From Swiss-Prot:
Homodimer. This is Putative iron-sulfur cluster insertion protein ErpA. Iron-sulfur cluster binds at residues 50, 114, 116. It comes from Burkholderia mallei (strain ATCC 23344). Its cofactor is iron-sulfur cluster. Required for insertion of 4Fe-4S clusters. InterPro entries: FeS_biogenesis, FeS_cluster_insertion, FeS_cluster_insertion_CS, FeS_cluster_insertion_RrpA, HesB-like_dom_sf. Pfam families: Fe-S_biosyn. One of its GO terms (molecular function) is iron ion binding. NCBIfam families: iron-sulfur cluster assembly accessory protein, PRK13623.1. Gene3D superfamilies: HesB-like domain (2.60.300.12). The lineage of its organism: Bacteria, Pseudomonadati, Pseudomonadota, Betaproteobacteria, Burkholderiales.
Length: 122
């Protein structure tokens, strides 16, 4: 397990991805609604979609040995080793605007995305 704490302190390892306050706050709200403080947000990449890969989000109680763990505002974000390589440098955000409310991943590794934005290729 690789643990990373997102912080302004210069002595800590920089976070491999950006987990925004808006995303962490929304996850915290969803966990509170579920009533299970052991839940953690798992972000993953899997094959599929029209561009080859797609993002997935799920709640998980378990931390796997190969997970990278990021803590933000009391919320734990998990990324497995396979997904890590596709998500390094990405920003995981939550947007609530005229287009609706959703988690959004801005990924600098994606070379193309589909029209709906739910799949990508590298």
């Amino acid at each position: 397990m690789n643990a990373v704490t997102e912080s302004a302190a210069t002595t800590e390892m920089p976070a491999p991805f950006v987990f925004t306050d808006a995303a962490a706050d929304k996850v915290k709200q969803l966990i509170d609604e579920e009533g299970n403080p052991d839940l953690k947000l798992r972000v993953f990449v899997q094959g599929g979609g029209c561009s080859g890969f797609q993002y997935g989000f799920t709640f998980d109680e378990e931390v796997n040995e190969d997970d990278t763990v990021l803590n933000k505002n009391g919320v734990v974000l998990l990324v497995d080793a396979m997904s890590y390589q596709y998500l390094v440098g990405a920003e995981i955000d939550y947007k609530d605007d005229l287009n609706g409310a959703q988690f959004v991943i801005k990924n600098p590794n994606a070379t193309t995305t589909c029209g709906c934005g739910s799949s990508f290729s590298v």
